[in-house]
Amino acid sequence: MDLPKNRFKAALRAGQRQIGLWHTFASADVAELMATCGYDWILMDTEHSPVGPAEALAFLRAVAPYPVTGVVRPGWNDAVEIKKLLDAGAQTLLIPYVQTPDEARAAVAAVTYPPSGIRGVAGVTRATRYGAIANYAERANDEICLLVQVETRDALAQIEEIASVDGVDGVFIGPADLAASFGYPGQPSHPEVKAAILDGFAKLKKLGVPGGILSRDDTLLRASAEAGAQFIAVEIDATMIRTAALARRAEWS
């Protein structure tokens, strides 16, 4: 059995824009439903959702039959948590709250086997298809895509250094936490925050490093795309359900 190809990583390297959704429910059914909708990637958020490795595994299995990449965000830049997600078969991870180049290097080490990294070796996991993939340990990193999240003023000031760490495949700018760090909590589209985000994407574009963002503000999203953002999440499942439910109820008020 061959190592699964990471369409998302290949698309980023080819300069192709990737449009995605945020998945927050511990529901493989919802994940599979979303996988039928034509998006390029779906991210399971374990940072701000009551989900763990078991639910992440169910998510990865649910989306696997479809032409969509399952991305997982661990709760923290934690080598043990990252190891579990990789062993479950995740090939693309978004690491939250990366503040410095050293923290980016720690994330790289966590997804890499020794001697270059610290990922623990286990031969019988879903990632190896329970031993069916030959030479998995030697080839795993060819298809692992590591995205790091910059979401504070201090981290944004170091975005070029963080993005330049060998092994980082993309940098995601988080508008919500960034706005809070600028003193505008709950205002991710504030002009000062927006200007900082667009400046960050311009720097990433100059370096040739893919940039990403999540927002429901189409004005911010389009400006980010024009500035160079390449992997763009345009909605959150919980928000879509709530918005549709409220709109339908209003029609029958």
Curated annotation (Swiss-Prot):
What InterPro entries does the record tag this protein with?
Aldolase/citrate-lyase_domain, HpcH-HpaI_aldolase, Pyrv/PenolPyrv_kinase-like_dom, Pyrv_kinase-like_dom_sf
Where are the catalytic residues? H48 (proton acceptor)
Kindly state which reaction or reactions the protein catalyses: D-glyceraldehyde + pyruvate = 2-dehydro-3-deoxy-L-galactonate
> Does the keyword field hold Metal-binding?
yes
* A GO term from the CC aspect: cytoplasm
Q: Site positions for Increases basicity of active site His, renumbered to this chain?
A: D87
> Can you tell me which residues bind a divalent metal cation?
E151, D177
Q: Which GO terms describe its molecular function?
A: aldehyde-lyase activity; metal ion binding
| Source domain of life | Bacteria
Q: Name the protein family.
A: Belongs to the HpcH/HpaI aldolase family.
* Role of this protein: Aldolase which can catalyze in vitro the aldolisation reaction between hydroxypyruvate (HPA) or pyruvate (PA) and D-glyceraldehyde (D-GA). The condensation of pyruvate and D-glyceraldehyde produces 2-dehydro-3-deoxy-L-galactonate. Has weak activity with hydroxypyruvate and D-glyceraldehyde.
* Listed name of the protein: Hydroxypyruvate/pyruvate aldolase
Organism field: Sagittula stellata (strain ATCC 700073 / DSM 11524 / E-37)
Q: What is the lineage of its organism?
A: Bacteria, Pseudomonadati, Pseudomonadota, Alphaproteobacteria, Rhodobacterales
